[in-house]
Curated annotation (Swiss-Prot):
MF-aspect GO terms: DNA binding
Feature: DNA-binding region: 272-303
NCBIfam families registered for this protein in UniProt: DNA_bind_WhiA
GO biological process, alphabetically ordered: cell division; regulation of sporulation
InterPro entries xrefs: Homing_endonucl, Sporu_reg_WhiA_N_dom, Sporulation_regulator_WhiA, Sporulation_regulator_WhiA_C, WhiA_LAGLIDADG_dom
UniProt family annotation: Belongs to the WhiA family.
A Pfam cross-reference name: WhiA_N
Domain of life: Bacteria
Lineage: Bacteria, Bacillati, Bacillota, Bacilli, Lactobacillales
Swiss-Prot/TrEMBL keywords: Cell cycle, Cell division, DNA-binding
Job description of the protein: Involved in cell division and chromosome segregation.
Protein name (Swiss-Prot/TrEMBL): Probable cell division protein WhiA
């Protein structure tokens, strides 16, 4: 199950008491038709649970029992498109939800009573996300939450509504509409709080923390590996110089203090400078070991 589906299923588990959730769904997924008996309203979704949710809201708030139809885009079951079809009280619904424009169409922007009221705003954002919202999988590390709108002014109003909740929302135009989006992990988690998807918010944070911890461990391992590689490279240079000294003037030609360091270096190529210092009979600092190794290398270079 995708993270987007998890969020939507959590939202569908809540009882919807604010009609502005339905307002957003109709605004973003609804279309008006005209027949002999008057206006009709069709609300489409590819999610059967969302279709049932829309049915329940219409039944609760307007005492309607709309028809649910479906057709298939392909032969695959998952490609069903569900339509909640309403023929009664359409004008009442549009007026009550403040959706109708002056030309008996659906108003494209967001009504001020929604923008100016926090509870209405939260409900509207819930409906908007249920309708066209998606969240990129949090373990991808490329965080993004998007809500698609057919109309640019609606996308901009959505961004302004999100900004009222201190979210850094942005809008980008597409060929067939516009997208309101969030790209910061903290904004996405806060958005999930706003729409009351607390379980999804906690799951998002947990996945984010696990990923960041894994990345920190990998970075630490990479640094350690690089340090070991540098140590071994420097170690092999010194060992080759010690062999050169042994083959030319002989190991005993080195002063005893240099011989001690040389013996530990040859015996333990992977030792760090500190480990060499700790292995000597006479205690020595790291700088003291480095000084002796430089002297060994200098002797070899002069041969």
């Amino acid at each position: 199950m995708s993270f987007t589906v998890k969020v939507k299923e959590e939202l569908l588990g809540h009882k919807s008491e604010n009609k502005m959730e339905l307002s957003a769904i109709i605004k973003m997924s609804g279309s008006l038709g005209l027949a002999n008996h008057g206006l009709n309203l069709s609300i489409t979704t590819e999610n059967a649970k969302i279709a049932r949710h829309i049915y329940s809201m219409l039944e609760e708030h307007y005492h309607l029992q709309p028809e649910i139809k479906y057709h298939q885009k392909t032969n695959l079951r998952k490609n069903r498109v569900y339509t909640v079809f309403i023929e009664e009280k359409v004008d009442v619904i549009l007026a009550d939800l403040k959706l109708a424009d002056a030309f008996f169409g659906i108003e494209t922007g967001i009504e001020h009573s929604i923008l100016d009221n926090d509870e209405n705003g939260r409900a509207y954002l819930r409906g908007a996300f249920l309708s066209t919202g998606t969240v990129r999988e949090p373990d991808s590390g490329k965080y993004q939450l998007e809500i698609f709108s057919v109309y640019l002014d609606h996308a901009q109003d959505l961004a302004n509504l999100m900004k009222k909740f201190m979210l850094d929302a942005k809008v980008i135009e597409h060929k067939h509409g516009a997208v309101t989006y969030l790209q910061k992990a903290e904004d996405i988690m806060d958005f999930l709080i706003v729409i009351d998807a607390m379980e999804a918010r906690d799951a998002f944070e947990e996945i984010k923390m696990i990923r960041e911890t894994r990345n920190d461990i990998n970075r630490a391992n990479n640094v350690e590996t690089a340090n070991i590689a540098r140590t071994i490279t420097a170690s092999m240079k010194t060992i080759n110089n010690i062999i050169k000294i042994m083959d030319t003037i002989g190991f005993d030609a080195l002063p005893s203090d240099l011989r001690q360091v040389a013996q530990v270096r040859v015996a333990h190529p992977d030792y760090s400078i500190q480990q060499i210092a700790d292995s000597l009979e006479t205690p020595l600092s790291k700088s003291g070991v480095n000084h002796r190794l430089r002297k060994i290398n200098k002797i070899a270079d002069e041969l």
